């Protein structure tokens, strides 16, 4: 369920910073909107996480992660307190469903929850459920296509807890892959002919997994994840230069490797 960045950063909404919590570090980004409907990077920073603080997208040590967030906020110089963050795709169940277009908002919510029971292998009181109407259904003018998303409450609460422990407020919870697509969509819109009929590839390279999405005219036509990432490069540096993992990671980030 992609974030509408224009809505998030509009005048009617409070300022937000984007916060990414990964296995290896936390990152923060603050944007501002220009008059020509483009965005400018105001501040950004990253702070490494202790090993084991986040494992497979799950927060294992709230204090270590919240301390890293406090450090990255200070490093960035941002004074914005409202945060947009996201859940790993692996922690979220998503499903597109078709529903009648003439349902009221309340009836739509009831119908979505009823449909969700078929796809979610947990009790409904254990999950947080959200949905958005994508648009008219492809094969019926009387129906709409709806995207529903659900995640275990405990996983969401852990991310909210580290944000609040850092003195911030979580305002938006998205899905990492959808947020990334929303961002690249903004860039595509600035290309010739708004990128129409052009193929774009989005690579999200994490410490252990690389996610690949191929987009055409706003639709994802192919996506896959590969079990390799930045940690493999760091391990190669360790072997080639005889450094510790921490030293190799620092030099990789700084571009401070010897010529030979």
Residue ranges, per PLM feature:
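Hydrophobic/aromatic-enriched cytosolic interaction surfaces used to assemble or bind macromolecules
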Residues: 1-260
């Amino acid at each position: 369920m992609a974030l509408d960045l224009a809505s998030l950063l509009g005048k009617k909404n409070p300022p937000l910073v984007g916060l990414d919590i990964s296995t290896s570090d936390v990152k923060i980004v603050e944007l501002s909107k220009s008059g020509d409907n483009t965005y400018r990077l105001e501040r950004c920073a990253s702070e490494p996480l202790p090993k084991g603080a986040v494992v497979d997208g799950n927060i294992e040590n709230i204090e270590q992660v919240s301390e890293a967030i406090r450090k990255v906020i200070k490093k960035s110089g941002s004074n914005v307190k409202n945060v947009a963050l996201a859940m790993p795709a692996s922690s979220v169940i998503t499903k597109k469903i078709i529903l009648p277009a003439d349902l009221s908002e309340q009836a739509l919510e009831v119908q979505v929850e009823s449909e969700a029971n078929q796809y979610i292998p947990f009790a409904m009181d254990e999950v947080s459920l959200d949905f958005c109407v994508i648009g008219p259904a492809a094969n019926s003018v009387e129906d709409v296509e709806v995207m529903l998303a659900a995640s275990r409450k405990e996983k969401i609460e852990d991310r909210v807890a580290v944000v609040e422990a850092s003195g911030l407020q979580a305002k938006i919870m998205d899905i990492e892959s959808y947020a990334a697509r929303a961002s690249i969509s903004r860039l595509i819109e600035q290309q010739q002919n708004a990128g129409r009929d052009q193929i774009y590839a989005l690579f999200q390279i994490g410490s252990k997994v690389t996610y690949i999405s191929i987009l055409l005219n706003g639709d994802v036509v192919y996506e896959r994840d590969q079990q390799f990432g930045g940690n493999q490069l760091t391990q190669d540096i360790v072997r080639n230069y005889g450094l510790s993992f921490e030293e190799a990671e620092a030099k990789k980030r700084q571009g401070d490797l010897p010529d030979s």
